[in-house]
């Protein structure tokens, strides 16, 4: 096919940092709502895992929305971050209401992913 995975399949790259910041701001609002916190956790962790594939999709020449293949492809390109991404995958499937667990992953893997996106694709990152 003439379709080539890459930036044209990268819906989340330009706004990913905004998603991370939004969730970090919303966590205190969900402290007394465990179900809401789990929904928030599941949403942002799915976003992290899928965005990780967008980061390497052009190089890997792959695209999928399935979470485990997103993780597998990312782990091949960034083995040093594979364990953290696997944790994000686990939380995408089995979300937690533990704000500290969510915040810790956002502050480490989420911020690193934002930096890596900005480094690799400075022309597509939308700054707030």
For each feature predicted by the language model, list its residue ranges.
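Conserved nucleotidyltransferase catalytic core and NTase-mimicking acidic/glycine-rich helix/loop elements
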Residues: 5-128
């Amino acid at each position: 096919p003439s379709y080539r995975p890459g930036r044209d399949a990268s819906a989340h790259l330009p706004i990913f940092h905004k998603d991370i910041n939004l969730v970090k701001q919303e966590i205190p609002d969900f402290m007394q709502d465990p179900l809401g916190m789990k929904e928030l956790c599941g949403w942002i962790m799915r976003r992290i895992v899928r965005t990780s594939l967008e980061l390497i999709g052009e190089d890997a020449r792959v695209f999928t929305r399935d979470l485990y293949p997103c993780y597998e492809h990312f782990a091949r390109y960034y083995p040093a971050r594979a364990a953290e991404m696997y944790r994000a995958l686990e939380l995408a499937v089995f979300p937690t209401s533990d704000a500290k667990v969510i915040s810790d992953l956002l502050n480490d893997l989420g911020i690193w992913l934002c930096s890596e996106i900005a480094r690799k694709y400075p022309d597509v990152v939308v700054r707030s």
